[in-house]
Amino acid sequence: MDERIKVLAKTLVNYSMKVQKGEKVCVHYTGEATQGLARQIIKEVYKVGGIPFPKYTDTRVLRETLLNCTKEQMELKGKIDATLMEEMDCYVGVRGSDNVSELSDVPSEKMAIYEKYYSTPVHHDVRVKKTRWVVLRYPNNAMAQLADSSLEAFEDFYFDVCNLDYAKMLKAMTHLVEYMDNTDEVRIVGPGTDLTFSIKGIPAVPCAGESNIPDGEVYTAPVKNSVNGTIKYNTPAVYQGFTYENISLTFKGGQIVDASSNNTKRINEVFDTDEGARYIGEFAIGVNPHITKPMKDTLFDEKIMGSFHFTPGSCYDEADNGNISAIHWDLVCIQTPEYGGGEMYFDDVL
């Protein structure tokens, strides 16, 4: 067993989830490559007196299920798994599918059924709100290919990024959290972007290894109806198996009134999932100094130093702006010079 896997498993169990004796832990792993880490997590859970409950997902089997799924089927599946999740104290999701596009040909109406009747009741309503949870990707050939890297070099990068001193990172975020907490209006400008919104009265929350690995962001949410202007995202975004590029959104009174991308019809179908899908649920700033370029993986891309993400869909309880949706889609814009630059003003201060 790679010693770095052992270090990561200990971090997940002892720092991220803080598993205590007698607590029940859902160990949810996706893809064959994740089995080694899943086994090590189970060992660490037992070491601290916890009780692991492993759950495996194969995305090819999931695709086959979703192609002809019904509302009634997903409602029952969601009810069963939500009941199980209610029993858990902690949750770790290790995701390592060997094909990020596996669900790309599932019809949008079927994905909407899955999001609304399964993902929302199981994950948003129970897992996020009632467990100490952490999610992460696991390095495999698919991820290395997306990062234009050999597998060995990508594994080295991955473990360097994931096995950071997150307690030290948390302390370093203090100033940014305080600054955001004291800000009313935010203005963001850049190539194709001129956007204004308020974050007044909504807490800024630091993220340092407790819910995501890798981590490194400070998030809040805009006042729901305060968003106006246009944003042009410069980072590809994989959602439901499809890679979106050149995404541009225009807002009026908080609502997305125009959306375009390399597949404008498909992206508008996502935003038509429900009313809340056309409003923003999160605004966050990425601060991980080890992540500097996109790799079509949200958990990494949203942490890029010099980036921000502006997220259509549901908000988090910790930074509640009242928006509710079956989707939560982190879309990333990088403002470093290599990606066109840009400026961010807090109450007119750069």
Report the location of each language-model feature.
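Intrinsically disordered terminal and processing segments
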Residues: 309, 313-350
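Active-site lining segments that contact anionic ligands and/or coordinate catalytic metals
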Residues: 228, 244-246, 253, 278-282, ...
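Active-site bordering "gate/hinge" segments
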Residues: 1-229
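Short, glycine-/Ser/Thr-/acidic-enriched flexible segments
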Residues: 32-33, 97-99, 140, 202, ...
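Oxyanion-binding "anion nests"
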Residues: 215-259
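Short polybasic amphipathic segments
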Residues: 185-188, 247, 340-347
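Short acidic-glycine loop/turn motifs at beta-strand connectors
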Residues: 191-192, 199-201, 251-253, 346-349
